[in-house]
Each structure stands twice: as structure tokens, then as C-alpha cells.
């Protein structure tokens, strides 16, 4: 009591303390970063290696495997996957959450160095690594277009100057430049001209390499001067290479231009990028795993004026895609929802109390509690994101509850004629323990969340801590500022035998009288209520098992990502045509604002597209509805498929897949994997619970298999190395020399001119110069026949892997899809040599499913322990927790009614309900116990009186919590997919709980009281003195 008096009788000190909390909160709010969700990105590092011309199998065995063995020894690696394609290997390392990305990068570099001696010769550069997740959607895409500059020249400018500058911005992890490749001098050989001149391809290669050297020449000096020696030992342009003498035939010089076309071109002509209908160079910017997306985007935008100032006038630099506008719009929606919740809660208080002065007290307590929370959020390193702001929105109903309980009890004493300061002190003393019990038991609900590991634990930690801090500050404010304001602002009134009945007051009195009448009937029919209570418990179990489940609500971020998968034998020219066709279909959709895409590189039959939709206010359809509409149009394109998915703020795993969810097949036998993967994929494609089923296993690419006759080769004086070198020189886009320029290094690329390699007959024109100097056609010692070969070889760990990706049809939940996949795998009878498991988001969902019930039980157990300690009783906590089954039924029925699956957000709602609905029981039980102790009432009289006396605060607190959550249900616009499941769960649970617990709680209270008396009689024995 002295504690309360200290603040009630010292108003200046109390006001200043509240002002200090508010000022700290305002300062914290200004310093808090902004993000879509809490930081939950796994540390990911990507290792890249290249060997131009090498087959996928060669890359997997000679490059990927040595690197994987070395990288696999690094501590903290959670998952290692690799993909090897034509001339390229990419290894993705996903580390544990607690692994520092910079320390991991040092370990990766050390592992690369250790594996260097095991890698094949001829690699143009050492393997490199990047601290970015390639499966993440870019946070921003910039495009460069020009009417006068070539694509190669644009690419050079983008990669040499723009990408380097952008990469230095804080938060940027990777700048991937696509759409073309670096400039190069391309030597297109004419096989017939070479044969006529008796010049081998190796001879051409060696002549070019020898003519373009960069070596130090030294200096000459005398006693006075020093001269640096400089020679014209470098050739830099196609015009300089054309007159190069490569051979003498009967004393006549054979120049390079005689046997080849030499052009200024690009390193890899099999690359194409587009924005809308124009050829373009794309700069795809990804953030570091630990970086804040909004701060990073703001840093890039701040740099754009400087970038535009440095580019030539002939180049047009545009932002093709920016993730931040929808994130900002979503957060603005949450902030507006928070403001509406505060207003509705204050309105509820006013309608019940019918006093402007009384309403002003919680109207001050709520902002102080919420604003003060920002200071703690800043100190904890949190951000303003959808979850933390939703926590504050929900907290609105909680923080006002404490103030309402104190205010209502003080107002009751004032209505009885007590003086204001005395009423404030007496009223606060009576409900102080109740408020503390309510707050501590509510915070206890979130303790299991704080101890939860993995991605769900990281994701929910900010929500739990933010809400707990808001409740803690609210507790302090309600026991200090609220009673002080009541004592100094409210006035006592003369006791009335008949309360004034006006408006809401008349309705409340009528409700209270009706409740009293119905409660008497219920207390006389306790068995029927007991059956209802047990029915809600059983219904809870059935609903939880039956309701569809998912990991996280599908968001409409306004950004779509698409993966193109064409026939495995498609040419680059045909693939570029497919890209253009798909982009036209998408560009013509009324909901699309911008589309960019690229194809080429090591995987000729694949491409990527990034689609920006119009803002939510300018389109009627959701992102999923747009995808459904486009899927029908895109299916008409022959020879290729485009798989679309909405970009999400949470992306788990480092695999690049053409759909949102993945199921991975592993085997130590590549043959077994290749046998069973098509069967499994075909079976999964037939499931109605899955859509867009596709696989990264591509082993039907067209291959020309050359079979050497080694005996003939030996007789003709030809070795295998010379034959392989011939093929590499002719068809491998072989980089044979380096051109050094001040800003970059460029390559000289040699291959047979595409005019002479349009079909298989090009092999018949190839020849090798043997040891006697004779030209021997390839057909003399080799035979070839077409075959199928993999376009890529994938590993997970050190096992062969194939990932089947899939999306969900509209109306299907992830739990239904995973159950269907598991059932299909069992029915197929897949042998133990092929192992299947979910990966990425689907894997995290499976883990979350296994821990959900444990988490709910742990929360209930924690609340029970806290209540048991506070009440010094094993029984009373059970009475209080009896309110939970009805809330669970209401929440699950509401989700079913709105056709919303049970997600991680809905789980938060269930956890919140555990904390909310028990408040009603706490208020009843506290007053009943006090009435039994001090008033000498029977348990029946005590609980009946407690229910009637606490009816008004129970209605006020429940309606405050309900109206605090209602804006989440009704909210639309950006980010509503996250807010609505939380609001639906809470509103549904509160409505059902309010209808039932007003009757079940007193019945359960009496049941346990009678049980206690029965056991006490059995155990009572007379005390015998010895």
C-alpha cells in the first residue's frame, strides 16, 4: 500500500516518470530501422567456379566434388548444395543462425585454397565466393538501355563501373550483371580454309597467344637519364588481329584473316536480357543476409543521382524493380491499423464509463505504454516491421486492460461516495494483485517462444519481446500513473440506490441483470455445463487435426518471379524467342507494370523473369489471382514452360527453384536417382494438391557422343589430348588470350564460325595435324552418334540430388500438399537407395508442425506454474485455465469460416488467446476468494457475487481486446495477408470465450472447490499428542 501511495500522493514525480518513458520511446522510434519482417535470413555464401567448355558431369566430378569435400569440413554448415552445368559450378553453403557471416567467409576462402591443388588445370580463374543467397529475389533491379551502344559495351560499363560502385554501398551483398557478357575479340574459324592451308586449330591458338603478350621489358639508363622500354607486344582490337601471320604455306604467309572472321564482339554470345520490349543489361542487386532491406535500398537510391551523372548521355538508367514501396506501404497500413485500434479501444472505455475525465486516463496510459516500448525495441536491436507493429496493435487491448481494471474499481468506490485519493489508494490496493497476476501470466505465455529455436523462434522473438515489454510498461503505468490520475482528476459522487440508466449504461445494466438470471440457472445445472466444457475440449482436438495448415501466409508483395524451363535440346536462338514470347504475354496483362528477363549462360534452356505488378490500389486481383490468370495463357506456348511465384519476404534455403516449395531426392547412386526421379515427378504432377511441378534434374539434353578408335589414332600418330584440344578449340568458346585495358581485362575467344557449325556435319570438317604434319580428318579415327546427357548435375552434401519444386493451387494448404506427397511416396514403393525429404520452406514447415503442440502445451504449463506460485494453489490455476478450450474452438472455427489455414501467425493468435481469455477467470477467482476469506460467503455465493461485480470490467477488457484486434481482420491493402489471420484468430477466440466462460468458469470453480473439500475430509485425521 505504501508503494501505491508513493505515486498517488506525489503527482509531479509520477508525471515526470511517465514523461521520461515517453521521451525515451520517441527517441527510440526515430532510431529504429524499418523492415518487412524480423531479421531471419540464414547466413549464405555462394562459391562459383568455371571451366569453359567442360560438360556438367566433368564439372561435377573434377570441380564440385573436390571443393565440396573441403568446404564440408567448415564448422556451422547447415546445408551444402551444388549445381554443375556446362562450364560452370555453383556451390551454396547455408550456415547456422549463430554463425558470423564474415568468419564463415574466411573459412570458405581457406577451404578454397586447400582444394586448389585438386582442381583441374585450364581454369581461367580461381573459384570465388559471394556473401549472398542466389535464391533470394533481388531487392532492386536496374536496367541499362541504349540506342547507339552495343550490348557488350553496355555490359562492360555496367560491370566495370556501376556494379563496383553499387557493391560498396552498405548492405549490398551481390550485384549480378546479366543480359550479355564482357567485350571480347572473337575468332570465328573457317574449317575448310584451315584444311586447305594445312593449319591446325592448335597452331592458330598458339600463334594468337604468342602474338599477344604482356611482359616487363626493363629499362635503360645512363648517368643522367632513365628510359622505360615499351614494345607493341599487345594486340587489342579485331583489326589488329586480322593481319596476324599464323602460318607459312610454301613460303606464303597465311594470315588470321585468311582462315577466320575476326570481330569485336562479346565473350559469350549466348546471353540475352530484356526489359519490357527492349534489349537491356540488368543489374540485379541482392542484400547481405544480415542487412536491412529498406536501409540498403535507400542507400542505393541516394547513390543514383551520382550514378546517373557518371554515365554517358547515350545510356538510359532506370529502376525496373524495387521491393521497398510495397514494404513501406505495408508498414503504413499497420501503423494506420494501430492508430484505429487505439481509437476503438478508447471509444469502448468511453462508452462504458460515460465520462470524459475517466476516459482521458486510459487515453494517456495507452500511448505511454506503447511509445515507451519503442525504447526497449531499439535497445534490443529490433526493427519496425509487420510483426513488431502487429504486436503493438494487439498490445493496445492488453495495456488498456490493466488501466481499465484499476480505473473501474476506483470508479466503483467513487460511486459509493469515497473521497478521490482514498478511493484511488483503496481501489488500487484491492486489484493490485489481480493486475500483477494478469500481466505476469500473460508474459509467461511468451516464455516458450523466447526459448524456441530455428527460424520460427527467430521470427517470433521480436513479437514476443515487444508485446512483453509493452505489457510490463503497462503494468507499471497502471499501478502508478493511472491511480494518481484517478485520485486527482475524478470526483466522488453521492451514493445512489438506483444507478442512472442512460444509453450504454442502461444496456449494461440490462445485460448484467440478464446474466445474473442465467447464471443462477447454470449453477443449478452444472452437469450440463460440464458436458459443454468437455465438448469444447474434444472439439478443439478434432478441429486442430482437421484444419489445413501452412507455414506462413502467402504475401502479395507486388513482385512475381518466373523461371523458364524449355526443351532440353533447345538452341539459344530459339530460347531467346521463347523469352520474348513470354514477356509479351505478361506485358499485355492489365495488372502488370513492368517485366524484365534474361536467358543464356551455362544453361541454355532456362531463363529468369522478374515482374512488377501495379500497386494494390490500381489492380483488382491479388498476386495469386494474377498468376492463375497468366498460367492459362502461358500454357499455350509450345516447347517451354514459365513457372510463376509471388516473391515472399521469407525465403528459406539456397536452392534456386522454379516454385515456392521443394521436395529433394537424394541417392548415392546417380543411376537410381535418374531412374526414379521421372517416376516420382510424374506421380506428383498428377496430384490435384500440387501445381507447377518441375524438377532441376535435366538429363535428356542432346549430346553427340564421340568414340575414339585408339588403335587407329596410334597408327596415325594422334593422341587423345590433341583430339580433345581440337574439339575444345572448335566448339568450346575457348578463351585463348587476355587483352589488358586500364579498367578491365578482356578475352580473345576462339571457336568455329557459327556459319560452319549449324549441324552435326561440322564434325566432318574437323581435322588434326598428326606427328608427321599431315592433316587427318576427325572421321578417320572417331565415330559419333547422338545420345542423351545431363544439362546439370546436382549434389546435396556429397550425394547426388534432384529437387522437385511445386506451387500450391488456390485453396490448397501446404499441409494438404505435404500429406499427399508422403502418401504418394509410400504408394510408389521407392527403394531405400533413394531418399526423399522436404527442403526449404516446406522443411521448416514440417519442423514447425512437430513443435506446435509442444509449444502450446509449454505455454499452458508455464502459465500454470506462474499462477500456482501467485495463488499458492494447485487448483485455482486449473480454474483459470479452463477458459482456454472455448477460446481455441472459437479461433479454429473462425479460421475455417474465413477459409484461412492455420499458420505461424495463427499460432501467435492462439498463444495470445491463452493470455487474454484467462484474464476474465482471474478477475472472477480473485474476488471470489476475497469474498470467501473476508466476507464469510459460501463458494456458491462468492463466485456468484464475483461474476456480477466483475461483469462490467470483464466486458470492458474483452471488448477492448476485441476492438483492438478487429482492425486487423478488416484491414486490406498491402500486408493484409499477415494481419488478417492474427485478427481472425483473436476475434473468433474472444467471441466464443466470452459467450462460454462467463458460465463455465464459475462451474469449474465450484467443481474444484467441492473436489478439494472431498479430499480434505478423506485425508483429515485427528491429531494425537504423544
From Swiss-Prot:
Subcellular location as annotated: Cell inner membrane
Cited InterPro entries: AcrB_DN_DC_subdom, Acrflvin-R, Multidrug-R_MdtC
Cysteines engaged in disulfide bonds, as pairs: none
Keywords annotated in UniProt: Cell inner membrane, Cell membrane, Membrane, Transmembrane, Transmembrane helix, Transport
One of the record's GO cellular component terms: plasma membrane
GO molecular function: xenobiotic transmembrane transporter activity
Any Pfam family matching the protein: ACR_tran
Topology within the bilayer: Multi-pass membrane protein
Transmembrane segments: 15-35, 333-353, 360-380, 387-407, 431-451, 463-483, 528-548, 853-873, 897-917, 953-973, 984-1004
SUPFAM superfamilies named among the record's database cross-references: Multidrug efflux transporter AcrB pore domain, PN1, PN2, PC1 and PC2 subdomains, Multidrug efflux transporter AcrB TolC docking domain, DN and DC subdomains, Multidrug efflux transporter AcrB transmembrane domain
Family of this protein: Belongs to the resistance-nodulation-cell division (RND) (TC 2.A.6) family. MdtC subfamily.
Name of the featured protein: Multidrug resistance protein MdtC
Originating species: Salmonella agona (strain SL483)
Amino acid at each position: 500500500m505504501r508503494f501505491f501511495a508513493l505515486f498517488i500522493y506525489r503527482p509531479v514525480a509520477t508525471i515526470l516518470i511517465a514523461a521520461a518513458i515517453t521521451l525515451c520511446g520517441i527517441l527510440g522510434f526515430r532510431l529504429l530501422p524499418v523492415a518487412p519482417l524480423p531479421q531471419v535470413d540464414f547466413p549464405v555464401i555462394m562459391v562459383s567456379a568455371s571451366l569453359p567448355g567442360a560438360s556438367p558431369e566433368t564439372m561435377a566430378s573434377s570441380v564440385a566434388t573436390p571443393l565440396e569435400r573441403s568446404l564440408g569440413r567448415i564448422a556451422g554448415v547447415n546445408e551444402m548444395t551444388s549445381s554443375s552445368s556446362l562450364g560452370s559450378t555453383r556451390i551454396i553453403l547455408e550456415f547456422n543462425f549463430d554463425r558470423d557471416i564474415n568468419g564463415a567467409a574466411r573459412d570458405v576462402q581457406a577451404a578454397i585454397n586447400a582444394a586448389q591443388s585438386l582442381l583441374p588445370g585450364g581454369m581461367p580463374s580461381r573459384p570465388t565466393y559471394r556473401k549472398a543467397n542466389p535464391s533470394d529475389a533481388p531487392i532492386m533491379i536496374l536496367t541499362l538501355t541504349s540506342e547507339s551502344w552495343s550490348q557488350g559495351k553496355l555490359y562492360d560499363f555496367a560491370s566495370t563501373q556501376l556494379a563496383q560502385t553499387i557493391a560498396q554501398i552498405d548492405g549490398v551483398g551481390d550485384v549480378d550483371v546479366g543480359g550479355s557478357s564482357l567485350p571480347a575479340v572473337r575468332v570465328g574459324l573457317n574449317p575448310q580454309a584451315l584444311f586447305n592451308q594445312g593449319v591446325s586449330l592448335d597452331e592458330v591458338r598458339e600463334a594468337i597467344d604468342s602474338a599477344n603478350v604482356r611482359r616487363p621489358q626493363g629499362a635503360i639508363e645512363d648517368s643522367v637519364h632513365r628510359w622505360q622500354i615499351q614494345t607493341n607486344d599487345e594486340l587489342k582490337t579485331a583489326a589488329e588481329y586480322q593481319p596476324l601471320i599464323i602460318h607459312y604455306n610454301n613460303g606464303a604467309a597465311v594470315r588470321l584473316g585468311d582462315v577466320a572472321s575476326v570481330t569485336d564482339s562479346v565473350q559469350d554470345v549466348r546471353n540475352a536480357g530484356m526489359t519490357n520490349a527492349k534489349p537491356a543489361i540488368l543489374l540485379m542487386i541482392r542484400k547481405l543476409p544480415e542487412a536491412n532491406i529498406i536501409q540498403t535500398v535507400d542507400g542505393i537510391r541516394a547513390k543514383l543521382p551520382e550514378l546517373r551523372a557518371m554515365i554517358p548521355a547515350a545510356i538510359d538508367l532506370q529502376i525496373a524493380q524495387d521491393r521497398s514501396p510495397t514494404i513501406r506501404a505495408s508498414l503504413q497500413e499497420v501503423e494506420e491499423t494501430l492508430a484505429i485500434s487505439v481509437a476503438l479501444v478508447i471509444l469502448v472505455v468511453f462508452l462504458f464509463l460515460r465520462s470524459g475525465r475517466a476516459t482521458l486516463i486510459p487515453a494517456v496510459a495507452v500511448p505511454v505504454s506503447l511509445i515507451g516500448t519503442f525504447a526497449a525495441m531499439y535497445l534490443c536491436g529490433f526493427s519496425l516491421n509487420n510483426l513488431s507493429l502487429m504486436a503493438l496493435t494487439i498490445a493496445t487491448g492488453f495495456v488498456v486492460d490493466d488501466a481499465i481494471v484499476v480505473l473501474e474499481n476506483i470508479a466503483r468506490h467513487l460511486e459509493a461516495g469515497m473521497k478521490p485519493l482514498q478511493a484511488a489508494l483503496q481501489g488500487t490496493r484491492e486489484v493490485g494483485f489481480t493486475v500483477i497476476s494478469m500481466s505476469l501470466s500473460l508474459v509467461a505465455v511468451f516464455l516458450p517462444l523466447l526459448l524456441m529455436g530455428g527460424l520460427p523462434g527467430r521470427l517470433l522473438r521480436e513479437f514476443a519481446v515487444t508485446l512483453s515489454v509493452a505489457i510490463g510498461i503497462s503494468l507499471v503505468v497502471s499501478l502508478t500513473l493511472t491511480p494518481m490520475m484517478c485520485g486527482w482528476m475524478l470526483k466522488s459522487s453521492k451514493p445512489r440506490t438506483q444507478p442512472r440508466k442512460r444509453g450504454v449504461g442502461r444496456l449494461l445494466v440490462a445485460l448484467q441483470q440478464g446474466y445474473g438470471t442465467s447464471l443462477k440457472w447454470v449453477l443449478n445445472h452444472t452437469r450440463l455445463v460440464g458436458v459443454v466444457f468437455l465438448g469444447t475440449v474434444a472439439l478443439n482436438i478434432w478441429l486442430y487435426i482437421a484444419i489445413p495448415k501452412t507455414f506462413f501466409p502467402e504475401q502479395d508483395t507486388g513482385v512475381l518471379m518466373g523461371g523458364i524451363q524449355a526443351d532440353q535440346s533447345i538452341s539459344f536462338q530459339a530460347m531467346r524467342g521463347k523469352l520474348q514470347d513470354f514477356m509479351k504475354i505478361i506485358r499485355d496483362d492489365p495488372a502488370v507494370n513492368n517485366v524484365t528477363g534474361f536467358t543464356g549462360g551455362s544453361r541454355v534452356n532456362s531463363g529468369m523473369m522478374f515482374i512488377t505488378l501495379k500497386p494494390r490500389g490500381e489492380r483488382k486481383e491479388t498476386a495469386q489471382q494474377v498468376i492463375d490468370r497468366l498460367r492459362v495463357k502461358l500454357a499455350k506456348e509450345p516447347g517451354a514452360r514459365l513457372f510463376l511465384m509471388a516473391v515472399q519476404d521469407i525465403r528459406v534455403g539456397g536452392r534456386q527453384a522454379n516454385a515456392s516449395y521443394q521436395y529433394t531426392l537424394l541417392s548415392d547412386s546417380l543411376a537410381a536417382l535418374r531412374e526414379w526421379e521421372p517416376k516420382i515427378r510424374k506421380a506428383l504432377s498428377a496430384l490435384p494438391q500440387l501445381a507447377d511441378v518441375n524438377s532441376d534434374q535435366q538429363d535428356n539434353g542432346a549430346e553427340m557422343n564421340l568414340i575414339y578408335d585408339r588403335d587407329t589414332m596410334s597408327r596415325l600418330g594422334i593422341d587423345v589430348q590433341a583430339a580433345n584440344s581440337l574439339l575444345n578449340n572448335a566448339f568450346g568458346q575457348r578463351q585463348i588470350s587476355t587483352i589488358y585495358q586500364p579498367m578491365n581485362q578482356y578475352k580473345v575467344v576462339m571457336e568455329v564460325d557459327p556459319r560452319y557449325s549449324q549441324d552435326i556435319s561440322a564434325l566432318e570438317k574437323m581435322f588434326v595435324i598428326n606427328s608427321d604434319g599431315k592433316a587427318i580428318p576427325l572421321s578417320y579415327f572417331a565415330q559419333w552418334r547422338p545420345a542423351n546427357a545431363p544439362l546439370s548435375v546436382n549434389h546435396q552434401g556429397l550425394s547426388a540430388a534432384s529437387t522437385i519444386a511445386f506451387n500450391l493451387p488456390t485453396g490448397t494448404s501446404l499441409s494438404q500438399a505435404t500429406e499427399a506427397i508422403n502418401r504418394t511416396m509410400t504408394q510408389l514403393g521407392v527403394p531405400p537407395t533413394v531418399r526423399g525429404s522436404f527442403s526449404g520452406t516446406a522443411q521448416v514447415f514440417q519442423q514447425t508442425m512437430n513443435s506446435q503442440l509442444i509449444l502450446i502445451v509449454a505455454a499452458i504449463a508455464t502459465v500454470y506454474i506462474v499462477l500456482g506460485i501467485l495463488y499458492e494453489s494447485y487448483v485455482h490455476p486449473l480454474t483459470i485455465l479452463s477458459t482456454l478450450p472455448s477460446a481455441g474452438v472459437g479461433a479454429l472455427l473462425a479460421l475455417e469460416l474465413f477459409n484461412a489455414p492455420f499458420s505461424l501467425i495463427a499460432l501467435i493468435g492462439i498463444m495470445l488467446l491463452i493470455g487474454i481469455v484467462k484474464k476474465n477467470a482471474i478477475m472472477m477467482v480473485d474476488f471470489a476468494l476475497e469474498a470467501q476469506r473476508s466476507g464469510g460467503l459460501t463458494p456458491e455465493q462468492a463466485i456468484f457475487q464475483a461474476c456480477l461485480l466483475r461483469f462490467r470490467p470483464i466486458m470492458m477488457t474483452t471488448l477492448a481486446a476485441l476492438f483492438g484486434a478487429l482492425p486487423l481482420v478488416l484491414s486490406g491493402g498491402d500486408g493484409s495477408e499477415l494481419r488478417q489471420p492474427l485478427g481472425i484468430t483473436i476475434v473468433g477466440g474472444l467471441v466464443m470465450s466470452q459467450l462460454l466462460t462467463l458460465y463455465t468458469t464459475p462451474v469449474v470453480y465450484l467443481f474444484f472447490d467441492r473436489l478439494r473439500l472431498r479430499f480434505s475430509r478423506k485425508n483429515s485425521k485427528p491429531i494425537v499428542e504423544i
